[in-house]
Amino acid sequence: MSDDARRILMAILLLGVAGIIAELLLLGHDEDFYQWIPIALAFATMLVSAIVVMRPAAGSIRLFQAVMILMIVSGAVGIYLHFEVNMEFQLEMDPALSGMNLYRKAILAKTPPALAPGAMTQLGLIGLAYTFRHPALLPRVAG
């Protein structure tokens, strides 16, 4: 991968993470411990990204990859949690709902948006793409 492509991926990652931080803080996504997890991970991503850009060594790249995996996992867990809350709310509103009707109402609910945490997963994947065949991870050829 070219250095330019790697820089573009990092820029996309940082813009996306900055957007997520702003959105979560503006929406008040800070009511309990679990709601702080994506905010903390987003800030960790910013910090580790700065380290990787300034000191691209194997150790910093591996740390960056670990944070990106946590971003991916947090997105999947967030989708589950948002969906779960939406299902509970829909059942409170209409206990007769079940099957596809319940699923449809829960997945399309506006608050919390069930698929919004998927942005964390997408950004984690972009971060992992940044590390693909990173020069700091390639074996050194003696010669």
Q: For each predicted feature, which ranges?
A:
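Cytosolic juxtamembrane helix and N-cap/initiation of the first transmembrane helix
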Residues: M1-L14, R133
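Transmembrane alpha-helix entry/boundary detector in multi-pass membrane proteins
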Residues: S2-R7, L24-T45
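Interfacial segments of alpha-helical transmembrane regions
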Residues: R6-A11, A58-V73
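Core segments of alpha-helical transmembrane spans in multipass integral membrane proteins
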Residues: L14-G16, W36-A50, I69, V73-A76
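Membrane-helix interface and helix-disruption motif detector
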Residues: L27-W36, N86, L108-A116
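Canonical alpha-helical transmembrane segments
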Residues: F43-F64
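C-terminal TM-helix exit segments that contain a strictly Trp-centered aromatic cap at the helix terminus
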Residues: L70-E92
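Alpha-helical membrane-associated segments of multi-pass integral membrane proteins
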Residues: D94-L137
